[in-house]
A protein has these predicted regions:
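HKD-type phospholipase D/PLD-like phosphodiesterase module
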Residues: 48-50, 57-88, 98-251
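C-terminal motif of bacterial Sec signal peptides marking the signal peptidase cleavage site
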Residues: 23-26
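Short, low-complexity, disordered segments immediately C-terminal to signal peptides
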Residues: 33-41
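Bacterial N-terminal signal peptides that target proteins for export
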Residues: 2-14
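Short acidic, glycine-rich surface-loop motifs adjacent to enzyme active sites
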Residues: 94-96
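Bacterial signal peptide processing site
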Residues: 28-31
């Protein structure tokens, strides 16, 4: 009698589990985005900035060419980023796969806040795959009038992300590994470094060996256009539409 009861109970659990799997996928679909006007880098005129005054004559003297400087040293790569943030006067467009809440991540975010405070328009596009521990910070930063943050291909289940992996693997496996950094449409920095201690010789455990390239010239135009394509992609969601302010105790 006990065995039959156990079998019946197990069957009920299995049936309930199957029912859950059949009904939940409808809930995994990302919410429909609010209608948005596409944004493009050159909507902001950066032709009179200090960086433009330096770069424009070089481009006029070398039409169609690209100048570059390879950043092998991690501290030089960090200094280049911070210096570009400080020099930007109109816009900063940043795209990263990983941005951690560590010393490097915090240092760069504080620099971006200072830039936004002086009127620079900041667009930050982050892949959502590693954003779980940062989403509350992103949501708070997005309250700034000059900071816009989007998450690329976000998880529908914010707390239990494994559910997306089980129920929507094909979509969730499409990740954005791009790393680009653009100041006033004039200077771009691309490469393998994310914004995390391990990429800048700051981690106390291990370091990644990566390289960046700083660019001026025609290649920058391609990087600007690529950023715009990702920013306006259907998979790029404003953090305000995905992350709950109530969950992170924000108004």
């Amino acid at each position: 009698m006990r065995l039959r009861s156990l079998k019946s109970s197990s069957g009920a659990v299995l049936l309930a589990s199957c029912s859950l799997l059949l009904t939940v996928p409808a809930c995994t679909t990302l919410p429909r985005q609010m209608p948005q006007v596409p944004q493009y880098a050159h909507d902001i005129d950066a032709s009179q900035t200090s960086l433009s005054q330096i770069v424009t004559p070089l481009r006029e003297q070398n039409p169609g060419l690209t100048g570059y400087h390879v950043l092998y040293d991690p501290l030089e790569a960090l200094a280049a980023r911070l210096r570009l943030i400080d020099k930007a006067e109109k816009s900063l467009d940043l795209q990263y796969y990983i941005w951690d809440n560590d010393r490097i991540g915090a240092l760069a975010l504080h620099a971006l806040i200072r830039a936004a405070d002086r009127g620079v328009k900041v667009r930050l596009l982050i892949d959502d795959n590693n954003a779980k521990n940062m989403e509350g910070i992103y949501l708070a930063l997005s309250q700034h009038k000059n900071i816009e943050i989007k998450l690329f291909n976000p998880y529908r289940f914010r707390k239990y992300r494994a559910m997306d992996m089980v129920l929507d693997l094909k979509r969730i496996n499409r990740r954005m590994h791009n790393k680009s950094f653009i100041a006033d449409h004039q200077i771009a920095l691309i490469g393998g470094r994310n914004m995390s201690n391990q990429y800048y010789n700051v981690s106390e455990t291990y370091q990644f060996s990566d390289v960046d390239v700083m660019l001026v010239g025609s290649a920058v135009d391609d990087i600007v256009h690529s950023f715009d394509d990702y920013w306006n992609d259907d998979y790029a969601y404003p953090v305000k539409e995905i992350v709950s302010a109530q969950r992170h105790h924000l108004r």
